[in-house]
Amino acid sequence: MISAGVDSSDLAKRGESLIRQSSNRYLTTVRIAFRAKQRRFDDFDGLLEESSVKPVQRAIVELSDEQDQPDLLPG
C-alpha cells in the first residue's frame, strides 16, 4: 500500500484530487484529520506495523484510493 516514504508530488496530487472532487472542502479536511487521528491511535495500540509515513499522509493516500477505486471497499 504505502512504501517507506511517500513521494511529495504524488501526495500533493492526491490531496488536490480529494479537494477538487469534493462538494465541501471543510468536510474533506475534517475527514482527512479524523482518519489521521484514527491511524495515529492504531499505531499507538500496536495494531499497525511501525511506519515512517505520518498519519496525515497515510490518511490522504487511503482516502484518495477509496475515492479512485470504490470497488475495493468491503461491503
Swiss-Prot record:
Q: Which GO terms describe its cellular component?
A: DNA-directed RNA polymerase complex
Q: List, alphabetically, the Pfam families matched.
A: RNA_pol_Rpb6 (PF01192)
Highest taxon of the lineage:
Bacteria
Q: Give me the reactions it catalyses.
A: RNA(n) + a ribonucleoside 5'-triphosphate = RNA(n+1) + diphosphate
Q: Is Transcription there in the keyword field?
A: yes
List its EC numbers: 2.7.7.6
Specify whether Transcription is a keyword of the entry: yes
Any one Gene Ontology BP term: DNA-templated transcription
Query: What are the protein's UniProt keywords?
Result: DNA-directed RNA polymerase, Nucleotidyltransferase, Transcription, Transferase
Q: What does this protein do?
A: Promotes RNA polymerase assembly. Latches the N- and C-terminal regions of the beta' subunit thereby facilitating its interaction with the beta and alpha subunits.
Summarize the subunit comment: In cyanobacteria the RNAP catalytic core is composed of 2 alpha, 1 beta, 1 beta', 1 gamma and 1 omega subunit. When a sigma factor is associated with the core the holoenzyme is formed, which can initiate transcription.
Family assignment?
Belongs to the RNA polymerase subunit omega family.
Q: What protein am I looking at?
A: DNA-directed RNA polymerase subunit omega
Q: Which organism is it from?
A: Parasynechococcus marenigrum (strain WH8102)
Organism lineage reads as: Bacteria, Bacillati, Cyanobacteriota, Cyanophyceae, Synechococcales
Record gene name: rpoZ
